[in-house]
Swiss-Prot record:
One of its GO terms (cellular component) is chromosome. GO terms for molecular function: DNA binding; nucleosome binding; structural constituent of chromatin. This is Heterochromatin protein 1-binding protein 3. GO terms for biological process: cellular response to hypoxia; heterochromatin organization; nucleosome assembly; regulation of cell population proliferation; regulation of DNA-templated transcription; regulation of nucleus size. The modification Phosphoserine is found at S6, S142, S155, S156, S247, S441, S442, S445. The gene is Hp1bp3.
Length: 553
């Protein structure tokens, strides 16, 4: 054991210089390799990774010392290059592995960026798709409330709160003004998107604002309670403004193409067709004189008659039910003539859904009906309005791109006959006025005819009075002839009584009575003559009085 320990002690110090020399040789080789390579990072990696095997070798040598130094040198020199060579390819293999990882990261980043861009685009599209309700849309109360709830508050096309307040006050106005309760109910019912039940402060702020401006006046109560009235503006400044405007040349009011488009779509849409229920609804609403609700058979008979004549085509259904389509000869429809046929024509044209139109037809319509000052500028405005309406959700482009293709109305639009065919309605109103005038004139003539009947009825009982008067005249006329001295004096009387031609027939009758009567009747004649001559003028009366005195004497 002692010999072993001594040998171990002698061998161990000898092995140390050999190991140190091997390390130095190895370090020189590593320096040469590092100079040859272009990557500076490998030095640190090699130094860190090469140290552990040397320590292991040292430990192994300490644990298992060998007697031969040459063998140790050979082993160390052989084992070290074997351990050194394999790490190089592993590092080189690690580098290409790192490169695909970085590529994968870049690809993932690019994919995330594309996803974000797609999300942004989708959000922008959603913002564009959000619909607002146009002013021309004909919706029922339930449809309007539903649409207003669906549309966002910011993009809803309602007026400002001040305008809504004045509108509500005018609508709810009574003798004592419009109460706040009635105003609140009106706004909640008509503008549900305001959500005034939760946000009551909007009404209070609007009331305060309008009171300060002097637009409204508080009749009763204080603060945000009581009754309010809209202050009427004086008309004098308006008159002066109108005079100033009248002095200058009045330019034609420019019509917005936004308001023109729905009517253009209804007129230009082809083919025009509508169901029986829609036709009946329209006719009963705008033509109450026809009484379609009470007498639906009239409408059914008119539809069947139009189909038989070839003025309409029945696409679906049988009899008077189903869908009917208008037929045209050129641009004019075949249907027309009577009031019922005209009502059916306007109903089918108005209730046709969906309403579509091409851009070429729209251009032609705008240039013909709304040419403006410059046609090119008008086409530019049409393009801009189409884009605006498409963003607002009023129109939808079915085919084509940009300023070409076909567009469709997204909301229903049912115009009245006066808007659809204003010329025909004006002609019809003139005809109706003429008919009414004729009826009134006939009624007046009928009213004028009965009065003569009444006069006759009144005259018939008065006939005996006339007879008595004639008898008195007959009795009076011969009495006038009796005094012979008076004929020369009383000459103006025949001028006042021209009907002397009739007297001869009447004069002949009393003559026999005078002959028949005895002489005793002469005493009665002067009394009668005195009574009747009292009716004569003053001169005659005085003369008659003198004669009466003479006769008495």
């Amino acid at each position: 054991m002692a010999t072993d320990m001594s040998q171990g002690e002698l061998i161990h110090p000898k092995a140390l210089p050999l190991i140190v020399g091997a390390q130095l040789i190895h370090a020189d080789k590593l320096g040469e390799k590092a100079d040859d390579s272009t990557m500076p990072i490998r030095r640190a990696v090699n130094s860190t990774r090469e140290t552990p095997p040397k320590s292991k070798l040292a430990e192994g040598e300490e644990e298992k010392p060998e007697p031969d130094g040459s063998s140790e040198e050979s082993i160390s020199t052989v084992e070290e290059p074997e351990n050194e060579t394999p790490p190089a390819p592993s590092r080189e293999a690690e580098q290409p592995k790192g490169e695909p990882e970085s590529g994968e990261k870049e690809e993932s980043k690019s994919a995330e960026e594309t996803k974000k861009e797609e999300k942004d685009q989708s959000k922008e599209k959603e913002k564009k798709v959000k619909k607002t309700i146009p002013a021309w849309a004909t919706l029922s109360a339930s449809q309007l409330a539903r649409a207003q709830k669906q549309t966002p508050m910011a993009s809803s096309p309602r007026p400002k709160m001040d305008a809504i307040l004045t509108e509500a006050i005018k609508a709810c106005f009574q003798k004592s003004g419009a109460s706040v309760v009635a105003i609140r109910k009106y706004i909640i019912h008509k503008y549900p998107s305001l959500d005034l039940e939760r946000r009551g402060y909007l009404l209070k702020q609007a009331l305060k604002r309008e009171l300060n401006r002097g637009v409204i006046k508080q009749v009763k109560g204080k603060g945000a309670s009581g009754s309010f009235v809209v202050v009427q503006k004086s008309k004098t400044p308006q008159k002066s403004k109108n005079r100033k405007k009248g002095s200058a040349v009045d330019p034609e009011p420019q019509v917005k193409l936004e308001d023109v488009l729905p009517l253009a779509f209804t007129r230009l849409c082809e083919p025009k067709e509508a169901s029986y229920s829609l036709i009946r609804k329209y006719v009963s609403q705008y033509y109450p004189k026809l009484r379609v609700d009470i007498r639906p058979q009239l409408l059914k008979n008119a539809l069947q008659r139009a189909v038989e004549r070839g003025q309409l085509e029945q696409i679906t259904g049988k009899g008077a039910s189903g869908t009917f389509q208008l037929k045209k000869s050129g641009e004019k429809p075949l249907l027309g003539g009577s009031l019922m046929e005209y009502a059916i024509l306007s109903a089918i044209a108005a209730m046709n859904e969906p309403k579509t139109c091409s851009t070429t037809a729209l251009k032609k319509y705008v240039l013909e009906n709304h040419p403006g000052t410059n046609s090119n500028y008008q086409m530019h405005l049409l393009k801009k309005t189409l884009q605006k309406c498409e963003k607002n959700g009023w129109l939808e482009q079915i085919s084509g791109k940009g300023f070409s293709g076909t567009f469709q109305l997204c909301f229903p639009y049912y115009p009245s006959p006066g808007v659809l065919f204003p010329k025909k309605v004006s002609d019809g109103s003139e005809d109706e006025d003429e008919e009414e005038d004729e009826e009134e004139s006939s009624e007046d003539s009928e009213d004028e005819e009965p009065p003569p009947k009444r006069s006759l009825q009144k005259k018939t009982p008065a006939k005996p009075q006339g007879k008595t008067a004639s008898m008195k005249q007959r009795g009076a006329k011969p009495a006038r002839k009796v005094p012979a001295a008076q004929r020369g004096k009383v000459r103006p009387l025949p001028k006042k009584a021209p009907p002397k031609a009739k007297t001869p027939a009447r004069k002949g009758r009393p003559a026999p009575s005078a002959v028949k009567k005895p002489s005793g009747s002469t005493s009665k004649k002067p009394v009668a003559n005195a009574r009747k001559e009292a009716k004569l003028p003053g001169k005659g009366k005085s003369a008659m009085k003198k004669k009466s005195f003479k006769t008495k004497k």
